[in-house]
UniProtKB/Swiss-Prot annotation:
Enzyme class: translocase
One BP term from GO: photosynthesis, light reaction
Gene responsible for this protein: ndhH
One GO term describing the cellular component: chloroplast thylakoid membrane
Keyword Translocase found: yes
Protein's job: NDH shuttles electrons from NAD(P)H:plastoquinone, via FMN and iron-sulfur (Fe-S) centers, to quinones in the photosynthetic chain and possibly in a chloroplast respiratory chain. The immediate electron acceptor for the enzyme in this species is believed to be plastoquinone. Couples the redox reaction to proton translocation, and thus conserves the redox energy in a proton gradient.
Entry EC no(s): 7.1.1.-
Keyword Thylakoid applies: yes
Gene3D superfamilies: Cytochrome-c3 Hydrogenase, chain B
Name the record gives this protein: NAD(P)H-quinone oxidoreductase subunit H, chloroplastic
Pfam family, one: Complex1_49kDa
Organism: Nicotiana tabacum (Common tobacco)
Length: 393
């Protein structure tokens, strides 16, 4: 009897676009040699909605509801970047109270985003319990958002020159109570997860990125800081009122999935410190500035000769973007979220280029998963933290 002949072929597997661990509509074409990954090709574009083109025929206020659909888990950051550009073009001074309110909202949004990263990341590698715990704290943040903005998600709260409404009565006390409660929650997560031997087996030494490699790929956010690069735009660019608070940049040297987890856990604690300081030191005064003070270059102005305009807040404003270009950026939960804005002396931007952190961080995925096991793809992709809304735009 002749023995059956065996063939050793590579196998091609489709992961996604409807797989639960793909975090949206990402499709990976994975080439396998047994359990080992030989090649991985991400296929993007399933959630492309033409966000950059839509911006070119909308005023800034009309465009604000659209931007919350990029990274729909950290909508305050997309709103912040959308109004920061026109503010810098128009030389609009933001009142101190409005700046403090913005910082509070941004840091609450950062915590909510990191929480909804942590739960699915743990579920991807087999730990179901934290997935239910994180919704408990995240629900409290959404209650705070709803009280201040009227919306739990897609808040539409930031405005050119300030915010849409002041903080309601009793909101500050409620937020301080949340901060005290949340610190005990983070301690609970660390006790449950950080020293868990099964968790450490799955993430330690998996998906290592060196510091030089991270810089060469243009990575940002926790991906960059977990590779030993101490770079945070809140410290570098000095935007809003971050310089007035005492906090530390969270970073690790190892560059693996565990380091990225530790950076994000540390960032949640630092965000609570920033929120507590902002709530205790929030000044009085207006929450918006509807006045533009800008040089009128056509009149050959003399020193201190400014053109004054008033922005109407409720309807679409007649606020013109002056004829210049500008790149603005903020430190979003996933990395550097930037806008390259070109004005054309019109109420519509001539060009609105989005620099999404998730799209650029995702580029390194094929390199990270090569020569790893199939099961490690979930760990590595989860540690990158992507949202397909901002990847595809």
């Amino acid at each position: 009897m002749t023995a059956p002949t065996t063939r050793k072929d590579l196998m091609i597997v489709n992961m996604g676009p409807q797989h639960p661990s793909m975090h949206g509509v990402l499709r990976l074409i994975v080439t396998l040699d047994g359990e080992d990954v030989v090649d991985c090709e991400p296929i993007l574009g399933y959630l492309h909605r033409g966000m950059e083109k839509i911006a070119e025929n909308r005023t800034i206020i009309q465009y604000l509801p659209y931007v919350t659909r990029w990274d729909y888990l950290a909508t305050m950051f997309t709103e912040a970047i959308t109004i920061n550009g026109p503010e810098q073009l128009g030389n609009i001074q933001v009142p101190k109270r409005a700046s403090y309110i913005r910082v509070i909202m941004l840091e609450l949004s950062r915590i909510a985003s990191h929480l909804l990263w942590l739960g699915p990341f743990m579920a991807d590698i087999g730990a179901q319990t934290p997935f239910f715990y994180i919704f408990r704290e995240r629900e409290l943040i959404y209650d705070l958002f709803e009280a201040a903005t009227g919306m739990r998600m897609m808040h539409n709260y930031f405005r050119i020159g300030g915010v849409a409404a002041d903080l309601p009565y009793g909101w500050i006390d409620k937020c301080l109570d949340f901060c005290d409660y949340f610190l005990t929650g983070v301690a609970e997560y660390q006790k449950l997860i950080t020293r868990n031997p099964i968790f450490l087996e799955r993430v330690e030494g998996v998906g290592i990125i060196g510091g030089d490699e991270a810089l060469n790929w243009g990575l940002s956010g926790p991906m960059l800081r977990a590779s030993g690069i101490e770079w945070d735009l809140r410290k570098v660019d000095h935007y809003e009122s971050y310089d007035e608070f005492d906090w530390q940049v969270q970073w690790q040297r190892e560059g693996d999935s565990l380091a990225r987890y530790l950076v994000r856990i540390g960032e949640m604690t630092e965000s609570i410190k920033i929120i507590q300081q902002a709530l205790e030191g929030i000044p009085g005064g207006p929450y918006e500035n509807l006045e533009i003070r800008r040089f009128d270059r056509l009149k050959d102005p003399e020193w201190n000769d400014f053109e004054y305009r008033f922005i109407s807040k409720k309807p679409s404003p007649t606020f013109e973007l002056s004829k210049q270009e500008l790149y603005v950026r903020v430190e979003a939960p996933k990395g550097e979220l930037g806008i390259f804005l070109i004005g054309d002396q019109s109420v519509f931007p001539w060009r609105w280029k989005i620099r999404p952190p998730g799209f650029i961080n995702l580029q390194i995925l094929p390199q990270l998963v090569k020569r790893m096991k199939l099961a490690d793809i979930m760990t590595i992709l989860g540690s990158i933290d992507i949202i397909m809304g901002e990847v595809d735009r």
